[in-house]
């Protein structure tokens, strides 16, 4: 007999405005505890010192996490010029310095090389796995790692402000797997002056925005209350980038059993990914083919 999962069967999204000094996993654990939820997970790690959007999926919404991790994300960050660190952020040991300070036109010109499809080497202190071990664990032991470059789509990278000669504030919109610390490091190298991230904030991730996020302090204050539950957004928010197809009653019943089900299509093309709903509730995600949705993920709501 299977073990009964403890907690409430809550499905949806809680958008947290993560504070600095807290890991993404710690935020997820706090949300799970505060809501008494059976299951929770996040849609994209933020470094402990970073702030901003951490979208926490609850229950059946965890099945939609890939659609948020694959979505575009926006980061606002400050690069400290003239100083390189082991971690490529302000927490690390200083390993290089330079007196050179580029002018704004030089920075603007250098940013062009970081837009579009780029190849990016992750920071030494990152969660990338090297022969089964996390890079940050090996780096802490003093190993110098030769990490492979990875592709990254950068939709935009803009200079926002220049508070002084030592600092430049940037905003980047990018796809899955981007390391802002690598951008700061590589930009500093391109400018011949070194650089690291001084602070970082994720302002939006897919459909979720920081201004809609709840603070950890508020989560603590409202823990175990129905008022906190009112902050949970519908599961369907995680499917914002996919077309919705209303299912027929019979189609919904078949989809819930994992079988192809009839849906009412509009302008969805054959072979396109979509999600089916019935009476306002998500039923399944799948591939549309000739009047039916062939499910790949079924929601038990």
Curated annotation (Swiss-Prot):
It comes from the Bacteria. GO terms for molecular function: RNA binding; tRNA pseudouridine(55) synthase activity. Its EC number is 5.4.99.25. The keyword tRNA processing applies. Gene3D superfamilies: Pseudouridine synthase. GO terms for biological process: mRNA pseudouridine synthesis; tRNA pseudouridine synthesis. Keywords: Isomerase, tRNA processing. The keyword Isomerase applies. It holds the Pfam family TruB_C_2. The active site is at residue 47. It catalyses: uridine(55) in tRNA = pseudouridine(55) in tRNA. Belongs to the pseudouridine synthase TruB family. Type 1 subfamily. PANTHER family: PSEUDOURIDYLATE SYNTHASE TRUB1, TRNA-PSEUDOURIDINE SYNTHASE. Responsible for synthesis of pseudouridine from uracil-55 in the psi GC loop of transfer RNAs. This is tRNA pseudouridine synthase B. It comes from Cereibacter sphaeroides (strain ATCC 17025 / ATH 2.4.3).
């Amino acid at each position: 007999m299977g073990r009964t999962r403890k907690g409430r069967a809550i499905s949806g999204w809680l958008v947290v405005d993560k504070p600095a000094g807290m890991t993404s996993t710690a935020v997820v654990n706090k949300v799970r505890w505060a809501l008494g939820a059976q299951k929770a997970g996040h849609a994209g790690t933020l470094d402990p010192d970073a702030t901003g959007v951490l979208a926490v999926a609850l229950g059946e919404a965890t099945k939609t996490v890939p659609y948020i991790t694959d979505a575009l994300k926006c980061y606002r960050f400050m690069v400290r010029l003239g100083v390189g660190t082991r971690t490529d952020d302000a927490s690390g040991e200083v390993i290089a310095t330079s007196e050179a300070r580029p002018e704004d036109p030089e920075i603007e010109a250098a940013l062009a090389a970081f837009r579009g499809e780029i190849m990016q080497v992750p920071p030494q202190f990152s969660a990338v796995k090297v022969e089964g071990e996390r890079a940050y664990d090996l780096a802490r032991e003093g190993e110098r790692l030769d990490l492979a470059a990875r592709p990254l789509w950068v939709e935009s990278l803009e200079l926002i402000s220049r508070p002084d000669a030592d600092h430049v504030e940037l905003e980047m919109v990018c796809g899955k797997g981007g390391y802002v610390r690598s951008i700061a490091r590589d930009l500093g190298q391109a400018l011949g002056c070194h650089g690291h991230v001084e602070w970082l904030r994720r302002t939006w991730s897919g459909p979720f925005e920081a201004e809609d996020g709840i603070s950890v302090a508020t989560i603590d204050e409202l823990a175990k209350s129905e008022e906190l539950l009112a902050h949970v957004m519908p599961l369907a928010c995680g499917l914002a980038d996919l077309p919705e197809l209303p299912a027929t009653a019979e189609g919904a019943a078949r989809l819930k059993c994992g079988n192809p089900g009839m849906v009412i299509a509009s302008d969805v093309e054959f072979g396109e990914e979509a999600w089916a709903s019935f009476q306002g509730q998500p039923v399944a995600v799948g591939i549309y083919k000739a009047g039916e949705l062939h499910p790949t993920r079924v929601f038990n709501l």
